[in-house]
Amino acid sequence: LDNIVLNIKNLSFYYKKDSPIYSDFNLVLQKGELVSIFGKSGSGKTTLFELILGNLKSQNGTIEKSKISMIFQDPFNSFHPTYTIYEQISDVVQRDFKEELDKVLPKLNLDLEILYKKSYELSGGQLQRCSILRAVLQKPDLLLVDEPTSALDNIVAYDVMKLLITLLKDCAILLVTHDINMAKWCSNRIIRLKDADK
């Protein structure tokens, strides 16, 4: 039981009563597991994340979760343009992590100088790696990953997932994707969602 980082029981959610997005949905995630939520646009993938994060309230069921971090779909929306990457990571991590950077930055193909830049000065790939860095330094039990590769080309996309798996091997990862090949390649389990709201 100590290994369980996400436990969703009998979850029901709808925007319209006659079109449930989830009906008695159950999901258990353990440390080290990577589970992909696969489905088309409108099938409820992002809704599930909003429910887990507490941004939406379900009509029924319970969600028990451990410490969460998230990597967003658009790397350019992951950081505020007014502050440096370093300032924003510090604000979230809230501890001295300078020593950890020596180990993690080379694995992400980042250097310290990049962290003192602002988001508009960096490429999408660099920002996505900065998002991974932030997640790694947060040391979450559960990482929510929302289509992290959609803005990247195929080779870079797989590199990003390899980095996540390598650097967060003890963390459970819940990946939302519309790329079935990506899901098959990296997942322990795949959950297919139907177009519930269509």
Stretches found by the model and what they are:
Residues F38-K40:
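The feature captures the beta-strand-to-loop junction immediately N-terminal to the Walker
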Residues L53:
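Helix-to-loop junction immediately C-terminal to a conserved catalytic motif
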Residues D74, P81-F97:
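Q-loop/switch helix immediately C-terminal to the Walker
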Residues K118-L122, Q126:
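Conserved ABC ATPase signature
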Residues I132, V160:
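Hydrophobic anchor residue at the start of the ABC signature
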Residues L137-D141:
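A short, proline-enriched helix->beta-strand linker immediately N-terminal to the Walker B motif
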Residues L143-E147:
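Catalytic Walker B motif of ABC-type/P-loop ATPase nucleotide-binding domains
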